[in-house]
């Protein structure tokens, strides 16, 4: 089965069931399948062929979903473009992917057009979806052919294109549904952009089960309004955005009693956020772990949540924790997470060296560190490339951030290492405070010392109105680290 035939199958069984809602607009499965088929034929009429890359530069909407499903139906490879990227960054993705055509929403089209000027292979930028009829034949698509290239910033200077086939991406959605990580029915709220693996998975999972997906750009008030209006049963949230949902629910409570599952992932979930979410939403966030290259890998089951843990490996995931030599580490000791699963990528587009580093002896090497407790639960210990080494001691940025989040004045925290000639690296924390909160850098340092060893306590705390975010909404530690070179982006607290 391919993603396109999945939609057709669901539409045949439930043609009149709402597939997607966005604002006041709704489209049924029958309408979505018919529109996607007609658009797929039009794309093929333009000279595109199966395997060609189609760039998609569009916000979460019915139009965006239609473009994705049309690309999948035509056998094209969808190349989502992050809406926050600048023209030079978009140009790199155009060039690296070899995309021949791009659909860019009207407000975003100037950026795409500027980027395309430097890319001879990019033939057309379109900011409207055509409605012309076409009789082009829809090809049979091999499930093992690429369906999407998801560009991930990771920890390198240039983004890498993660390739997923129709089969591997449908395995991701199936694994999420089978493990109850994704709600298998009801109404799913899709606020994570579809250029993010989790955002696309939520939308396709709804098609997998014949559910309805409500598409909402992230705005805390709009998200909560949509939950109340559509009686949503599920959503996925990045921890950094979860903080803002709690603040908005405190400011103006909505009826969120319809919710059954809320999954947090993409970064560690502070215990303070868990506590506040439970207080104001009435149940616990279910923390999980995954990555663009491997799909959903671990999850806290609803009947046995361990706060602070990333959960248990999913049933279809072989997961090991290994030392730098590739040997399994003892229980309780940190090791790199390596996995083998039908959900994992074929590799990075046009980057054999990075692919060889990622995939070794059939195992996907995540670069993430964790330890396993006696009951098999996994506890995230940070990324190997983000570990701060101070005087020979390893310090996890996430552990320091967790301590800072316990302070009631802290809304956001990001911790990085600053090079130092004596200690190797110093611990530096960037903090954004809650509206109306007041605390000094020394006050936060004293608070942190109550929860951390002396060598883990930040030597410096710098305040920002808000922390910079990466393309997926996570705190951008790389930008924070670069700002330390001049200190131009922050002012030290008194």
Predicted region positions:
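Conserved AMP-binding/adenylate-forming
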Residues: 25, 40-85, 394
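Conserved ATP/PPi-binding loop(s) of AMP-dependent carboxylate-activating enzymes
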Residues: 312-316, 327-358, 395
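Conserved AMP-binding/adenylation subdomain of ANL enzymes
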Residues: 170-187, 195-233, 248-249
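Gly/Ser/Thr-rich phosphate-binding loop
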Residues: 208, 232-236, 246-307, 318
